[in-house]
């Protein structure tokens, strides 16, 4: 049975490995960078597979955080009461099993309990990540804007889901 748990330091090496296996859909990162991100996050969960091994994760940031991300700054200026999903990656072994939908339902519940109005995120358009974009649309996310980041090397679709969008 797949379970969710709070991310802690014992999970970081596995999280870095899963994250970097998702490149270019998510940026490659180091353990130190993920440790810094975890300090900013209000929500950081791992997805554990049937054997109890880390097979995915999600990291999200509350409004008002001291976080220097081009995409987060966009949402801060347009959606003041939002939970921003900075990173979500599921390993190949979990794909197509409904785990992503279950994970997002939990994220939406967490955001609603915290009094948030929206859950926000971005998905790469360049380099393309069409599967993720389709998944997010199915979860109730709406396209709100696009922007070039990382000096123009990445173009993202900015997405927002009003709470209550997922049944």
Where are these regions (language model features)?
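Conserved acetyl-CoA-binding loop-helix of GNAT-fold acetyltransferases
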Residues: 90, 96-109, 138
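A short, internal acetyl-CoA/4′-phosphopantetheine-binding micro-motif in the GNAT/acyltransferase core
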Residues: 76, 86-95, 124-125
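C-terminal "cap" of GNAT-fold acetyltransferases
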Residues: 77, 146-167
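Active-site rim helix/loop that mediates acceptor-substrate recognition in acyltransferases
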Residues: 24-51, 59, 65
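Conserved GNAT acetyl-CoA-binding A-motif
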Residues: 111-125
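A short beta-loop-alpha structural element at the N-terminal edge
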Residues: 1-15
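Conserved catalytic-core motifs of GNAT/GCN5-like acyltransferases
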Residues: 122-124, 137-156
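Conserved acyl-donor/pantetheine-binding loop and adjacent beta-alpha core of acyl/acetyltransferases
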Residues: 59-87, 151
């Amino acid at each position: 049975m797949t379970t969710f748990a709070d991310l802690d330091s014992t999970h970081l090496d596995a999280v870095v490995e899963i994250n970097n296996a998702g490149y270019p859909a998510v940026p490659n990162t180091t353990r130190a960078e993920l440790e810094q991100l975890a300090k900013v996050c209000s929500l950081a969960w791992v997805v554990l597979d049937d054997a109890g091994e880390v097979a995915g994760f999600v990291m999200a940031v509350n409004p008002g955080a001291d976080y220097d991300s081009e995409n987060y700054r966009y949402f801060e200026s347009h959606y003041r009461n939002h939970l921003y999903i900075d990173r979500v990656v599921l390993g190949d072994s979990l794909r197509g099993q409904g785990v992503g939908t279950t994970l997002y339902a939990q994220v939406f519940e967490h955001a609603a309990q915290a009094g948030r109005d929206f859950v926000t995120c971005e998905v790469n358009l360049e380099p393309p990540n069409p599967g993720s974009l389709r998944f997010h649309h199915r979860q109730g996310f709406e396209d709100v804007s696009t922007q070039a980041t990382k000096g123009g090397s990445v173009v993202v679709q900015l997405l927002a889901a009003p709470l209550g969008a997922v049944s």
